């Protein structure tokens, strides 16, 4: 046995891409990968299980790479066909993680083993053996506090997700990671027996019919080369890629043996077939499989319009990873391009498998009229580059096809033309127009930089996309205009709403992840104003449920902010009519309580105006308003929609539509109709679990042992936000 101190804990993440196209993408998507995980029972709980990464031990003096590859093969033999096991391409050390408990002071290494792209091979499920899981499904429920994973495995999976995201942004890294191993790339190895460099190697050690001297003499007798040409690229570090003209995948591969009884043998006169007939078959198959591509390629405007009316997708990629608009732009079909953009609402920056855009194709073909159409489109990214970092102008000047001079002139002029703008609204209804330097490829981060906010103020806010009944916070790398374009599909995925009644707009709003301790330190008047406008909006809409006394105080502050100091002649009993109350009292209280509050509101308003200890500067009053809002449980929450079921009688259930609020304090349920706060749970006092179908999640309160299920298509978003915000509470906030 080896020395225990020389034995290292090693965890292995075996990952494989679902398709080859994802390897060339600069944007990381977890759903494009699968990861190999074990399921092991939780100690003391027979029925419950948790997922763990593959784990092995490494001797300090052993060959690590081969040891890990052999371990993966042996571990996966029971689940693979013919007991072959999964053979990794290489072993990459990602990171070392400190261990807890008895092993404190030691570290465990996480090794990544990339495997082949997923195919139709069917793996058998064997109890106790690992199986592949979709990485996106795993990351949706992965957190260090989740009962679904071992704590160390959860930390490693979160680090792996971040690592893959960073590596996708590096050119050529991901394709190199999944490239076949050097051993796989060696096809033939030839050794010259006459080449003996070791002094101890004699003719007897060659074990061949000829001695080394005889072989050497025969070689010298052969005709020698007159010229020797060296490859100047050999041994250099220059990047190169093999250009593939066409990739053809056998659709029947992996489907098993065919039913030979159904195979029809053609007549003998048809046996001799030329390559041209084979090509014709392939073209006919392409025409049948991709009618929209064919009509775009041929410029058949009538057929193209009819297919679009039949809901054929403009985003579908064919076997060459081209979309219909790529064919229209490459072959110079002007009307087809216009129809795809206008009627088909096609993304003008849609990329093919080699990351080339429609503008690249039109410029490369020298089709000036199509270049003009694309440049006139408000969402086109004029600065877009392909996989090799080339702009459309570079491609145009390289190819020099057709009317390339005119196309190049248009591209050069477009660089200095004014950019399209998008309105970013604030919650008070005002907006700022921001330039879209990259069309609909412009990211949230780039829009935030165009908002003319200071660096300090930017960190408190982000861009939200909102319609009447759905609001989503976007991430810095998201492209808001593409979300606006895809809003009907997003609505269908997350709600049952009618897209015709939901018009999306972009808003500058408080970042839901902003800790209250940080917000309390804000002094910038502009930041305070933006926060105030949003808090006032949520208060009046009824999302801030609070005691009557708190709502009356907030109403008096709003009167001071809107109308200035109290004047007895001006602000009489009838001053607070129904119209004025709408601007200071939540909509849920207007009819039930607001008429009885008028005297109390005016009284507090008068006291506030005459108080010498209160600053009447606008940002100080707005800050006082925020200070009162900070105490409300739902302050700063992102709201989702859902339903809960309660027993109306022993025989049936009552459906209650609810708002699900998630903030840095915890989770809150509001009755959708009355805005009454049904339940408010702080982190640490409840547990959650995502349902199997991602259409519900379960909440268990540890204080009163109560459990309930919320049914919503947004369950995945709710659980992911809970995992992000859990643990962000400051110690001083936990008891407040």
Swiss-Prot record:
The keyword Repeat applies. Keywords: Angiogenesis, ANK repeat, Cell junction, Cell membrane, Cytoplasm, Cytoskeleton, Disease variant, Membrane, Repeat. ANK repeats lie at residues 287-316, 320-350, 354-383, 388-419. One of its GO terms (cellular component) is cytoplasm. Residues 1-170 are annotated as: N-terminal domain similar to Nudix hydrolase domain. The keyword Secreted does not apply. Changing residue 721 to A: Strongly reduced affinity for HEG1. It is a peripheral membrane protein. Changing residue 176 to D: Strongly reduces ITGB1BP1 binding. Residues 172-195 are annotated as: Interaction with ITGB1BP1. Residues 430-452 are annotated as: Interaction with RAP1B. Changing residue 192 to A: Reduces ITGB1BP1 binding. Changing residue 452 to E: Impairs interaction with RAP1B. It is found in: Cytoplasm, Cytoskeleton; Cell membrane; Cell junction. Low levels in brain. Very weak expression found in heart and muscle. SMART domains: ANK (SM00248), B41 (SM00295). Changing residue 179 to A: Strongly reduces ITGB1BP1 binding. InterPro entries: Ankyrin_rpt, Ankyrin_rpt-contain_sf, ARM_KRIT1, Band_41_domain, FERM/acyl-CoA-bd_prot_sf, FERM_2, FERM_central, FERM_domain. Its main location: cytoplasm. Residues 420-734 form the FERM domain. One of its GO terms (molecular function) is GTPase regulator activity. GO terms for biological process: angiogenesis; cell redox homeostasis; endothelium development; integrin activation; negative regulation of angiogenesis; negative regulation of endothelial cell apoptotic process; negative regulation of endothelial cell migration; negative regulation of endothelial cell proliferation. The FERM domain mediates binding to RAP1A and RAP1B and is necessary for binding to phosphatidylinositol 4,5-bisphosphate (PIP2). Component of the CCM signaling pathway which is a crucial regulator of heart and vessel formation and integrity. Negative regulator of angiogenesis. Inhibits endothelial proliferation, apoptosis, migration, lumen formation and sprouting angiogenesis in primary endothelial cells. Promotes AKT phosphorylation in a NOTCH-dependent and independent manner, and inhibits ERK1/2 phosphorylation indirectly through activation of the DELTA-NOTCH cascade. Interacts with CDH5. Found in a complex, at least composed of ITGB1BP1, KRIT1 and RAP1A. Interacts (via C-terminus FERM domain) with RAP1A (active GTP-bound form preferentially); the interaction does not induce the opening conformation of KRIT1. Interacts (via FERM domain) with RAP1B. Interacts (via N-terminus NPXY motif) with ITGB1BP1; the interaction induces the opening conformation of KRIT1 and competes with ITGB1 for ITGB1BP1 interaction. Interacts with HEG1 and CCM2; greatly facilitates CCM2-binding to HEG1. This is Krev interaction trapped protein 1. The gene is KRIT1.
């Amino acid at each position: 046995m080896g020395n225990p101190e020389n034995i290292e804990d090693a965890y292995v993440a075996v990952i494989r891409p679902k398709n080859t196209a994802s390897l060339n993408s600069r944007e990381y998507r977890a759903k494009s990968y699968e990861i190999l995980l074990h399921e092991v029972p939780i100690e003391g709980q027979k029925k419950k299980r948790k997922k763990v990464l593959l784990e092995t031990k490494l001797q300090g003096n052993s060959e690590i790479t081969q040891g890990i590859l052999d371990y993966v093969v042996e571990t996966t033999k029971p689940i693979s066909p013919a007991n072959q096991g999964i053979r990794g391409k290489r072993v990459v050390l990602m990171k070392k993680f400190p261990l807890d408990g008895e092993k404190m002071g030691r570290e465990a290494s996480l090794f990544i083993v990339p495997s082949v792209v997923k195919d139709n091979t069917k793996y058998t499920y064997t109890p106790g053996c690992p199986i592949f899981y979709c990485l996106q499904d795993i990351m949706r429920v992965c957190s260090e506090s989740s009962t679904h994973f071992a704590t160390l495995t959860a930390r490693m999976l979160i680090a792996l997700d971040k690592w893959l995201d960073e590596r996708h942004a590096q050119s050529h890294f991901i394709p190199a990671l999944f490239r076949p191993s050097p051993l796989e790339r060696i096809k033939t190895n030839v050794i010259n027996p006459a080449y003996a460099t070791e002094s101890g190697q004699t003719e007897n050690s060659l074990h061949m019919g000829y001695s080394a001297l005889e072989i050497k003499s025969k070689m010298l007798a052969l005709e020698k080369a007159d010229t020797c040409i060296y490859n100047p690229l050999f041994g250099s570090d220059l990047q190169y890629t093999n250009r593939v003209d066409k990739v053809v995948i056998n659709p029947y591969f992996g489907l098993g043996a065919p039913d030979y009884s159904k195979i029809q043998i053609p007549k003998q006169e048809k046996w001799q077939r030329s390559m041209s007939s084979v090509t014709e078959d392939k073209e006919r198959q392409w025409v049948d499989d991709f009618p929209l591509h064919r009509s775009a390629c041929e410029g058949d405007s009538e057929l193209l319009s009819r297919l679009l009316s039949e809901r054929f997708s403009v985003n579908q990629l064919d076997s060459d990873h081209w979309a219909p608009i790529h064919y229209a732009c490459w072959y110079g079909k002007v009307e087809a391009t216009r129809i795809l953009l206008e009627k088909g609402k096609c993304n003008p920056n849609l990329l093919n498998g080699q990351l080339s855009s429609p503008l690249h194709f039109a410029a490369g073909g020298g089709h000036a009229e199509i270049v003009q159409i694309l440049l006139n489109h408000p969402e086109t990214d004029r600065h877009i580059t392909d996989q090799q970092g080339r702009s459309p102008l570079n491609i145009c000047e390289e190819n020099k096809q057709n009317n390339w001079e005119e196309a190049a002139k248009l591209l050069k002029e477009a660089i200095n033309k004014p950019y399209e703008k998008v309105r970013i609204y604030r919650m008070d209804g005002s907006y700022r127009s921001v330039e879209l330097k990259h069309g609909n490829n412009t990211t949230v981060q780039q829009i935030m930089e165009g908002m003319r906010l200071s660096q300090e103020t930017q960190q408190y806010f982000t861009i939200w996309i909102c319609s009447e009944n759905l609001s989503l916070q976007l991430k810095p790398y998201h492209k808001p205009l593409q979300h606006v374009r895809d809003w009907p599909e997003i609505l269908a995925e997350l709600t049952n709403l009618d897209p015709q009644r939901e018009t999306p707009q972009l808003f500058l709003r408080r970042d839901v992840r902003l800790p209250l301790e940080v917000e309390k330190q804000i002094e910038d008047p502009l930041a305070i104003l933006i926060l105030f406008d949003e808090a006032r909006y949520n208060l009046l809409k009824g999302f801030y449920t609070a005691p009557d006394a708190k709502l009356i105080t907030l109403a008096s502050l709003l009167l001071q902010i809107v109308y200035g100091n109290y004047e007895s002649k001006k602000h009489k009993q009838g001053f607070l009519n129904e119209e004025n109350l709408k601007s200071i009292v939540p909509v849920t209280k207007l009819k039930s309580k607001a008429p009885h509050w008028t005297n109390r509101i005016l009284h507090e308003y008068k006291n506030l105006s005459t108080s010498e200890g209160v600053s009447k500067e606008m940002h100080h009053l707005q800050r006082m308003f925020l200070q009162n809002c900070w105490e409300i449980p739902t302050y700063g929450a992102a709201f989702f929609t859902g339903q809960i079921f309660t027993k109306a009688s022993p025989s049936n259930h009552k459906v209650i539509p609810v708002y699900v609020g998630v903030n840095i304090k915890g989770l809150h349920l509001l009755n959708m109709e009355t805005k009454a706060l049904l339940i408010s749970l702080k982190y640490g006092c409840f547990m959650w679990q995502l349902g199997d179908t991602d259409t519900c999640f379960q909440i268990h309160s540890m204080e009163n042992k109560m459990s309930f299920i919320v049914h919503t298509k947004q369950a995945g978003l709710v659980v992911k936000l809970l995992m992000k915000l859990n643990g962000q509470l400051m110690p001083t906030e936990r008891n407040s």
